[in-house]
């Protein structure tokens, strides 16, 4: 998907974060890998425009996958907010999304993100 502006980047990010979460739940790795690529492309576009702040409202989105991906994208830009969002997910979700949030925090602490 070719992103042309910030609005498209945000839509692409959110839609694909939702898809990625669904694929994580149901094991559809092919579709999940495609959505992952689209999320990363959206993050790269947003980064190139220096507009990470458009992702901050997504830290409170109803969809856990959207929140996790927003936190991932913001870990080096707004570390306190991103870490807080991930910790809340770990605390409140005992399923795969909680595990994903915990792994994201662990990898960040190790310096791998």
Task: Label the model's feature ranges.
Residues 62-63, 93-94:
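Short inter-helical turns and helix N-cap capping residues of alpha-solenoid HEAT/ARM repeat scaffolds
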